[in-house]
UniProtKB/Swiss-Prot annotation:
Gene: ves
NCBIfam families: PRK11396.1
Family: Belongs to the Ves family.
Phylogenetic classification of the source organism: Bacteria, Pseudomonadati, Pseudomonadota, Gammaproteobacteria, Enterobacterales
Disulfide bonds listed in the record: none
Name the UniProt record assigns to this protein: Protein Ves
Length: 191
């Protein structure tokens, strides 16, 4: 289990100067050719998403203005707050900030031939499904994960096991992404 606080994470500026990324985790850890990766991006200007052949990307708008996503003949989609949207990461996708204001989003990318991610928003106590990897990010409220208290802009990632997240207040929201491995693949094969 690895814990993080978005406010304390290192920031990598994009080459096109349109935004920045905070990498949460990758699997396998510290590998350039990852099977899955979670990150948070701040987008300050219109531009294109980086291409990642053979990957699927799920983007969830966390805050800021809505974002219009356009991919030639594939789709036109308005990204709304806390509504995950999946697309092939090898498609050219243009992002336009519809309100002209900076947006922040959660990204999870998975290698299509190895694993699949699901992203959802939780508003009550739950236990993970025993997936072989996952990430949680607190949008608001106070949550307990094991003996650790997580509050706004904090989270955790893990590479296996079942975990219970307890909401400690009457209300709270948390982004949860689980990783499931496709038949014939296992994280045990790469560690």
């Amino acid at each position: 289990m690895e814990y993080f606080d978005m406010r304390k994470m290192s920031v990598n500026l994009w080459r096109n100067a349109a935004g920045e990324t905070r990498e949460i985790c990758t699997f396998p850890p510290a590998k350039r050719d990852f099977y899955w990766r979670a990150s948070i991006a701040s987008i300050a200007a219109n531009g294109e998403f980086s291409l990642f052949p053979g990957m699927e990307r799920i983007v969830t708008l966390l805050e800021g203005g809505e974002m219009f996503l356009e991919s030639a003949d594939h789709f036109n989609h308005t990204l709304k707050p806390l509504q995950p949207f999946a697309f092939a990461a090898d498609q050219v996708v243009k992002a336009k900030l519809t309100a002209g204001q900076m947006s922040m989003d959660f990204n999870i990318m998975t290698r299509l031939d190895v694993c699949k991610a699901k992203v959802r928003i939780a508003e009550r106590t739950f236990t993970t499904f025993g997936s072989r990897g996952g990430v949680v990010f607190v949008i608001n409220g106070a949550w307990q994960l094991g003996d650790k208290l997580l509050t706004t802009d904090q989270g955790a990632c893990w590479f296996d096991g079942r975990h219970t997240l307890r909401l400690l207040q009457p209300q709270g929201k948390l982004l949860f992404s689980e990783i499931n491995w496709l038949a014939g693949h296992s994280p045990d094969q790469v560690q």
